[in-house]
From Swiss-Prot:
Chief subcellular location: cytoplasm
The species this protein was found in: Salmonella enteritidis PT4 (strain P125109)
Lineage: superkingdom: Bacteria
HAMAP family given in the database record: NadA_type1 (MF_00567)
PANTHER family per record: QUINOLINATE SYNTHASE, CHLOROPLASTIC, QUINOLINATE SYNTHETASE A
Binding site for iminosuccinate: 47, 68, 139-141, 156, 226-228, 243
Cofactor(s) recorded in Swiss-Prot or TrEMBL: [4Fe-4S] cluster
Ligand binding ([4Fe-4S] cluster): 113, 200, 297
Alphabetical list of NCBIfam families matching this protein: nadA, PRK09375.1-1, PRK09375.1-2
Lineage: Bacteria, Pseudomonadati, Pseudomonadota, Gammaproteobacteria, Enterobacterales
One cellular component term from this protein's GO annotations in UniProt: cytosol
Protein name stated in the entry: Quinolinate synthase
Length: 347
């Protein structure tokens, strides 16, 4: 008897933490990266969840700091022939899908994502085959192969609007891979949504009891929550949204103190947006518990200065993203559907 893959039961080994650099080493690699970016006609795109010094370097060199889709869109529009993607592997794949003519380099191809790992293509394809009457919607945090199996790709910033649209057409949905985001979208729309049971190892760790205690210490603080968090955390929020939406909420809310329930990498850009406000990390461990991620993705942490310099200098199979042409074509269709839908929302 075959046993169905259970993302909730999967344990993903974390990578070792990068060796800390001293100030002289940091300066050496910063200068080396700046030189290599010019020599390779490259631009650096970094995710909000990378370390502050990486985001700062992206800014200083004319690059981009954003969510995964905007990183790829920025790279596609940029004149550079090479993109250095500081993030996790699916982000590099998305950049390659949208810019097949460009060289896509990453500090390491071992930078994974628990949502991606928790949705292997063979098991997910079988799951979809078992429900042929449903439209398949997958989150951007998936492999190129999973995207190619989908009808739509979606980001958290437009997930509710897209599912509302599909529901209005009478469509039933398969949602993958994040069960918390899928549950949030279902509750917001009332749509018929069948969720794959994956989760982000960072957001899944936020704890209601610990957060309640923190709220008592800071009773006038607003709570900002990413919808990849458990429902009990989302229900406590003053604002729920994607990374970019949370930064906007930080500016809009009148509160002087903000408790932020997402990866602490976002603090760099959020603090720039609201320098007058105090940002507080939401707790990730319950009573007597020890956090695994401690509100920072361990794979994002692999994007260190030394690794970025090595990626630019060495290139090759250890650093360059490749996507099979047929797979790219299959993944591009649902990605373009999403981009077209997002454009109608902005119109």
């Amino acid at each position: 008897m075959s046993v169905m893959f259970d993302p909730q039961a999967a344990i993903y080994p974390f990578p070792p933490k990068p060796t800390p650099l001293n100030d002289d080493e940091k300066q050496f690699y910063r200068e080396k990266i700046k030189r290599l970016l010019k020599e390779r006609n490259a631009v650096m795109v970094a995710h909000y969840y990378t370390d502050p010094e990486i985001q700062q370097l992206a800014e200083e060199t004319g690059g981009c700091i954003s969510d995964s889709l905007e990183m790829a869109r920025f790279g596609a529009k940029h004149a550079a022939s090479t993109l250095l993607v500081a993030g996790v592997r699916f982000m590099g794949e998305t950049a390659k899908i949208l810019s097949p003519e460009k060289n896509i380099l990453m500090p390491t191809l071992a930078a994974e994502c628990s949502l991606d790992l928790g949705c292997p293509i063979d098991e997910f394809s079988a799951f979809c085959d078992a429900h042929p009457d449903r439209t398949v919607v997958v989150y951007a945090n998936t492999s190129a192969a999973v995207k190619a199996r989908a009808d739509w790709v979606v980001t958290s910033s437009i997930a509710v609007e897209l599912i509302e649209h599909l529901d209005s057409l009478g469509e039933k949905i398969i949602w993958a891979p994040d069960r918390h985001l899928g549950n949030y979208v279902q509750k917001q729309t009332g749509a018929d949504v069948l969720c794959w049971q994956g989760a982000c190892i960072v957001h899944d760790e936020f704890k209601t009891q610990a957060l309640t205690r923190l709220k008592k210490i800071y009773p006038y603080a607003a709570l900002l929550v990413h919808p990849e968090s458990p429902q009990s955390i989302v229900e406590m929020a003053d604002a729920v949204g994607s990374t970019s939406q949370l930064i906007k909420a930080a500016k809009t809310l009148p509160h002087r103190q903000l408790i932020v329930a997402t990866d602490r990498g976002i603090f760099y850009k959020m603090q720039q947006a609201v320098p007058e406000k105090e940002l507080l990390e939401a707790p990730t461990a319950g009573e007597g518990a020890t956090c695994r991620s401690c509100a920072h993705c361990p794979w994002m942490a692999m994007n260190g200065l030394k690794a970025i310099a090595e990626g630019l200098e060495q290139g090759g199979a250890a650093h360059e993203i490749q996507v099979d042409a047929a797979l790219r074509e299959g993944a591009l269709l649902p990605l373009n559907r999403m981009l077209d839908f997002a454009a109608t929302l902005r119109a």
